[in-house]
Amino acid sequence: MSKIRSSATMPHRDQPSPASPHVVTLNCIEDCALEQDSLAGVAGVEYVPLSRIADGKIESATAVLLHSLAYLPRAAQRRLRPHQLILCLGSADRAVDSTLAADLGLRLVHVDTSRAEEIADTVMALILGLLRRTHLLSRHALSASGWLGSLQPLCRGMRRCRGMVLGIVGRSVSARYLASRSLAFKMSVLYFDVPEGDEERIRPSRFPRAARRMDTLNDLLAASDVISLHCALTNDTVQILNAECLQHIKPGAFLVNTGSCQLLDDCAVKQLLIDGTIAGCALDGAEGPQWMEAWVKEMPNVLILPRSADYSEEVWMEIREKAISILHSFFLDGVIPSNTVSDEEVEESEASEEEEQSPSKHEKLAIVESTSRQQGESTLTSTEIVRREASELKESLSPGQQHVSQNTAVKPEGRRSRSGKKAKKRHSQQKYMQKTDGSSGLNEESTSRRDDIAMSDTEEVLSSSSRCASPEDSRSRKTPLEVMQESSPNQLVMSSKKFIGKSSELLKDGYVVALYAKDLSGLHVSRQRTKNGGWFLDTLSNVSKRDPAAQFIIAYRNKDTVGLRSFAAGGKLLQINRRMEFVFASHSFDVWESWSLEGSLDECRLVNCRNSSAVLDVRVEILAMVGDDGITRWID
């Protein structure tokens, strides 16, 4: 930076400017050499580990860099101030972090970049791994027996890519990149266009011409040898691959999911793997004990990644460089930034890149295809696809599709030009965030004096789900009845009926509760309506509050929303599905599993934070409480 201004000239309206601006990185960048060199003379940069959050450096910082606000411990969350600029680098769920920032009264800015190519590369690698069994054969690299010897059983089931049919669910940028890559491997491509967002935001899919659109999801499943999910998690896509839908899957097909775990019914997928209907499965992240049991670890046709499908060193460097540019503008020019990349901007950026790098011949082909679709061109059946496969493969190998590594320097320029068009749209959101700063400032000051060693949301999920372990873990771990001991009358209230006040104030993390129906006809329980099926919330009269099916653990997401974990469902959280059914389908704490509490414990109203029409009227009885010593004990 050619000119360094004094920190006294930097406008900070919330509090007086310090002598030298200070930037703190929390739980994201340990090696700050790049930031320190780029901001030399402008601001100091320091990494603060979570073990040193009580040193006071977070409160004195002008800007804070972090990966996700939701995964930050509450002790660190309470030390953040409304006047600070909070940069969220590459958040996995922007909506959750933005909601939490609004609750805490923080000024949060998301910094991200497109990761479509990384996702497409990972999916292609997973497909090749399942087809060629490379992850299994690599363990036997030193064997001298050859494929005619002991390795022959391991090679059974290996498939060639040429001639296989790839079915893509969704129309995201990563889906289109995957289509181009799979066509290069001489695979046929089908796709099912899942509408996402408002209708006016939906653009025509820009898949390669050789790809064919299917009218229904069931048709795609029946015709595909490999299925890959590339759709966002919405009300319409929750468990888009449920047990009923998976009945149409082609026997011997492979399933790949690098999106949300809630896109598919994990119990149904597990059963199909056991039955052999699905030949293999690859997931980017898995939830719950059903994916961590011994049988999964021993199955060679199951691949599980630690949520790393969208990562690359290039992506992380782009995000850090964007954050540095934002800090320069903030410190030197006093510019309050907005979110640098949104989902819509990523879509525009990748679409324009394809247009710039594709020849005019393909533009004409796209127009012809669009016209033929408007005239009512019918989609292909699986038989027609096989007949016309040879001609489709020739069209797929045209030079216009080889655009992955070209014109990489044009991409940032296009993003900067488009980001200016979004300024007015973000202006109203920025005003809301600034108003929230003033209203929530006093609450943040008071809460920051409380316990600084509170667990983060992720730690709460782990601690609560540890009480609901898998069957393998239960052999070496005591049951809740063995762990929870009787306490003295001075430590716990003798009966939950004595609680008077708002339910949100009386219920704490780790409490065990029972939910009675409003008409007192029975208890709400979690149960499987069919063998090996999903978990539902039902009302039964022939159960007691001591039955594990009727017991739920309270897990707070923030001060206003809670989650209900089921003992019987292995710690899964209560949520609402697209059929307006109360189900237990996920272990992760998202907005789908968040509920607001209204009224008292005797007349409590649970309202889903995602769908306000999903309401559960119950009477809550506290069965067990967490004492000051951290031990959960039953109430007599």
From Swiss-Prot:
Its cofactor is NAD(+). InterPro entries: AN-like (IPR045015), CtBP (IPR043322), D-isomer_DH_NAD-bd (IPR006140), NAD(P)-bd_dom_sf (IPR036291). Residues 369-384, 398-409, 430-445 have a biased composition (Polar residues). One of its GO terms (cellular component) is microtubule. Changing residue 118 to K: In am-EM2; decreased trichome branching and modified microtubule density along the basal-apical axis of the trichome. It is found in: Cytoplasm; Golgi apparatus, trans-Golgi network; Cytoplasm, Cytoskeleton. NAD(+) binds at residues 91, 147-148, 169-174, 193, 231-237, 258-260, 284, 307-311. Keywords: Cell shape, Cytoplasm, Cytoskeleton, Developmental protein, Golgi apparatus, Microtubule, NAD, Stress response. Residues 385-395, 470-480 have a biased composition (Basic and acidic residues). Residues 1-21, 341-489 are annotated as: Disordered. It comes from the Eukaryota. Its main location: cytoplasm. GO terms for biological process: cotyledon morphogenesis; floral organ morphogenesis; fruit morphogenesis; inductive cell-cell signaling; leaf morphogenesis; microtubule cytoskeleton organization; monopolar cell growth; nuclear migration. Cofactor binding induces a conformational change. The keyword DNA-binding does not apply. Belongs to the D-isomer specific 2-hydroxyacid dehydrogenase family. Plant AN subfamily. Involved in controlling the equilibrium between tubular and stacked structures in the Golgi complex. Required for cortical microtubules (MTs) arrangement that confers cell shape. Cooperatively with IPGA1, negatively regulates cortical microtubules (CMTs) organization in response to mechanical stress and modulates pavement cells morphogenesis leading to puzzle shape, probably in an AAA1/KTN1-dependent manner. Regulates the width of leaves by controlling the polar elongation of leaf cells. Involved in the regulation of trichome branching. Seems to not be able to regulate gene transcription. Homodimer. Interacts with KCBP and SUB (via intra-cellular domain); AN is not required for the correct subcellular localization and recycling of SUB. Binds to SOKs proteins polymers (e.g. SOK1, SOK2, SOK3 and SOK4). Interacts with IPGA1 on microtubule upon mechanical stress to regulate microtubule organization. This is C-terminal binding protein AN. It comes from Arabidopsis thaliana. The gene is AN.
